Amino acid sequence: MLSLAHFLVLGAILFAISIVGIFLNRKNVIVLLMAIELMLLAVNMNFVAFSHYMGDLAGQVFVFFILTVAAAESAIGLAILVVLFRNLDTINVDDMDTLKY
């Protein structure tokens, strides 16, 4: 039987991997978005673990709202990246240094 500590350690490991992904790869915007999404999933897993072990469904319902917002964030972020790639022919973070193109 898995305890709450197992889920919290796994969530902390996923969160740490996403932070390392953000710090090691600052050039590619797609990898940055994937690392941020992994960070949100680690937090969601902790919400589900806490709500399961406390016997309350509020945390699990809250996860659905977080996933909805994360999906909208990803869609908007990828749409912005498509527009930037069409205008600049790159998705490198260093090349995106001005606000107007």
Swiss-Prot record:
MF terms from GO for this chain are:
NADH:ubiquinone reductase (non-electrogenic) activity; quinone binding
Q: Which Pfam families match?
A: Oxidored_q2 (PF00420)
State its Enzyme Commission number(s): 7.1.1.-
Q: Does the keyword Transmembrane apply?
A: yes
A GO BP term here is: ATP synthesis coupled electron transport
> What's the catalysed reaction?
a quinone + NADH + 5 H(+)(in) = a quinol + NAD(+) + 4 H(+)(out)
- Tell me where the transmembrane regions lie: 4-24, 30-50, 61-81
The terms describing its cellular component in GO are: NADH dehydrogenase complex; plasma membrane
Cross-referenced InterPro entries: NADH_UbQ_OxRdtase_chain4L/K, NUOK/Mnh_C1-like
Name its cellular compartments.
Cell inner membrane
Q: How does it sit in the membrane?
A: Multi-pass membrane protein
List the keywords (alphabetical): Cell inner membrane, Cell membrane, Membrane, NAD, Quinone, Translocase, Transmembrane, Transmembrane helix, Transport, Ubiquinone
Please give the chief subcellular localization of this protein: membrane
Question: What domain of life does the UniProt record list for this protein's source?
Answer: Bacteria
Q: What family classification does the UniProt entry report for this protein?
A: Belongs to the complex I subunit 4L family.
- Record's subunit section: NDH-1 is composed of 14 different subunits. Subunits NuoA, H, J, K, L, M, N constitute the membrane sector of the complex.
What role is this protein assigned?
NDH-1 shuttles electrons from NADH, via FMN and iron-sulfur (Fe-S) centers, to quinones in the respiratory chain. The immediate electron acceptor for the enzyme in this species is believed to be ubiquinone. Couples the redox reaction to proton translocation (for every two electrons transferred, four hydrogen ions are translocated across the cytoplasmic membrane), and thus conserves the redox energy in a proton gradient.
Protein's recorded name: NADH-quinone oxidoreductase subunit K
Provide the gene name from the record.
Answer: nuoK
